[in-house]
Each structure stands twice: as structure tokens, then as C-alpha cells.
Amino acid sequence: MLTVCWFLYLVRTADNALYTGITTDVGRRFLEHQTGKGAKALRGKGELSLAFSAPVGERSLALKMEYRIKQLTKRQKERLVAGDGSFEALYESLQTPPVKRD
């Protein structure tokens, strides 16, 4: 069975807001956002730019990462986009199985 790789991405709007999403094809999804066929949250937001994208693997992990990143402050998202290592740390924290407690 073919495994599909999911990506997490952040889009920057004209007013400098960051939108977080997941997809299996970043180029296609970004084009959908640019042409008004993507998320309603980005429609009418002016010029869009792809600020960040990274492969995360399976869909379940991509959904977890998307949720966690959407919980971050704008400053924390900006650091992630700048490549401060926070994406890698978050990725690793979600890869580690939970500790079983007695």
C-alpha cells in the first residue's frame, strides 16, 4: 500500500497574519488559496505568500501538529517560520510515545 506524505504549511497574508494548514500537495493547495478556492479564512486577504512548509508524514501526525501550531502565539509562529528549531522540537515531542504510568 502506498503511503501518502502529509505536509504542514503556513501562509502569510497581506496584513502579516499567519494561516496554518495541512495538505498532501503544498503547491496545489497554495494555488487554491491564491485563487480563492482554498480556506474561506484566506479569501479577500490580499496577496498571500507561503511562509513555511515541512513534511510531517502521516495524516494523524499532521493533524496533531496543525492543532498544536494553531495554539501558538503569533510570536511563537514567527520563530517557527524563522527556523529557530521549535518545529523540530514539536515534531519530536509528538513522535515520542506517551509515558506509561503505573
Swiss-Prot record:
Residues 4-79 form the GIY-YIG domain. Gene3D superfamilies: GIY-YIG endonuclease. CDD domains: GIY-YIG_UPF0213. Pfam families: GIY-YIG (PF01541). Belongs to the UPF0213 family. HAMAP family: UPF0213 (MF_01029). This is UPF0213 protein Ent638_3592. It comes from Enterobacter sp. (strain 638).
